């Protein structure tokens, strides 16, 4: 198995509200029409983020659709500079997200904050001085070589 992720699918209870949030962040939907009524896809650099109804996603995975509170997953959005963290958090809040942890220096030497989207999915916005981003925003654990 190759070391990569193709799609991250987030289970949502309100597909319209979830789509409105990501649309408000300026993300462009990759699918339209009848297909987008059931699953919304956003093409990212080298992967896709999908939004799918919570119960349908659980049914497809053949697991019970239960779960509240921390789900054991935090998605990360890395930025090129320390000064970029707070504006991205503000953009998420303006789009309807909730700030969970304001921008602050992190124990590991970077700077980060966390917001929750309207469905409660956690997103860390981080600047990591030890892993500079590539020209297109690509992230690698030890930094991208351009």
Q: What residue spans do the PLM features occupy?
A:
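Conserved active-site tyrosine of GNAT-family acetyltransferases
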Residues: 18-22, 92, 120
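Short glycine-/small-residue motifs
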Residues: 124-125
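Conserved catalytic core of two-component sensor histidine kinases
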Residues: 9, 16, 86
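Short, surface-exposed ligand-recognition loops at beta-strand->loop->(often short) alpha-helix junctions
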Residues: 10-13, 81
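Vicinal oxygen chelate
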Residues: 1-6, 28-82, 86-116, 129-146
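Amphipathic alpha-helical segments
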Residues: 14-29
